[in-house]
Amino acid sequence: MSHEPNPHLPIPAAWRKSVVAILRKGEKAQIVVKQRARDEFSARFPDAWPYDRNGALADALTPTEVLGRPIFGMDEPGEVWAFWFHFRNVKLYAKINLTPSGKLIIIYSAHVPLKGEDKL
């Protein structure tokens, strides 16, 4: 039995498919990026564009099985998952909310790991 407080679980395929479709479409009206996520990604990669970040996030969610951690207690309603992604060979932490409509995502986090590279 795992004593890990937040074990990594498979992220549901339906959630991943919806989020990837929104990220790949790239419509600003469907992607809310919180200021912290925008600032931290831009600080680490000042020459990157939003579509670069979105593409890296989508690529991370595309494999058949992706492990992550469900997140509860966010202000906005929806299903939130944290997971790892890579951009320019740098491991990054992501946290994304797929809102109940299934047509809008909120990117809360897109930054280098703050709690170590093994803790989501």
Could you tell me what each predicted segment is?
Residues 91-120:
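Enriched for short, Lys/Arg-rich terminal
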